[in-house]
Amino acid sequence: MKVSIIGTGKIGTDLLYKLIKIPEYEIVAFVGRRDINKSIPTNVTYYSNGIKFFIDNPKSCDIVFDCTDAYSARENAKVFRNQGIYTIDLTPSKIGRLCVPNINCDCLHNIDNVNMITCGGQVSLPLLKYLKSKCNISYAEVVSQISSDTAGMATRINIDKYIETTESAIQTLIGVNNCKVILNVNPSPKTVMQTTIFIKTNQKVIFEDYDLFIKKTQNYINGYTSDVRPVYIKDNIVMVSVKVYGSEDYLSKYAGNLDVINCAAIEVSKKIFDIRNDKVDNHKNIYEIILDV
């Protein structure tokens, strides 16, 4: 399958180093908007003319990973749609269908643009789905912390969209309408990505299979690690916390926030690859087993 990446910042470059490990994928182009000032694999071709590359080379790939920013992605999507290129959008643009691999990969049929929400969304939504399978949730608060070293220009541009899109995904995919999302950027370069969730519930339950949930989520996010198991800090409030370590393909282990969205995007691309090769049942979400829902 022919794939391209537009956006050559930290997410795009880390994604590139992950994709070159997949033998079924041919990387057609790594596309930015300025001269490249970093080393990239010699077998990858870099283009500095941005979206114009795709305009000048229509239908050059089957899938494009958009790693730009939420505002650029909106304009890029028009070009990709006109050319019939499947877009996996790693910005919080909320243009395409919101998707988390172990929640709703069945949405990938009959669409041409899928949105990977945010790094915090990819960490918190599987956990919220697990919690909701155990108890009702009247309110959810998601607090994520990342290192400032992993927050590139596009991340800083997207802060408001990050919050808006993550909250929208919680409401849409989890069904918790009353929610709040907070993102803290820690100045320390050695800050592991951490997401802490607080939920309000009127049920007392035991989360006996929590370790199994963590293990199954690690099937595609290797660095997804339990920090604090679900615990009642008040009669009606449960707290749980996870950390995500980067796989160090290109970035450090402290870039778990970038690693998680790239891993999720690759998992989605593999699903699309299978769909195009008729390897899956079009009516079955094969990821349901991960959350046992």
Residue ranges: model-predicted function:
Residues 233-235, 277-281:
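A short, charged
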Residues 1-143:
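N-terminal Rossmann-like NAD(P) cofactor-binding subdomain of oxidoreductases
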Residues 279-291:
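Short, highly charged C-terminal tails/helix-capping segments
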Residues 6, 122-125, 129-236, 246-248, ...:
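Active-site-lining helix/loop region of Rossmann-like oxidoreductase modules
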Residues 238-241:
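A generic structural motif
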Residues 269-277:
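Short, hydrophobic alpha-helical segments
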Residues 34, 146-149, 287:
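Short, conserved aromatic-histidine micro-motifs
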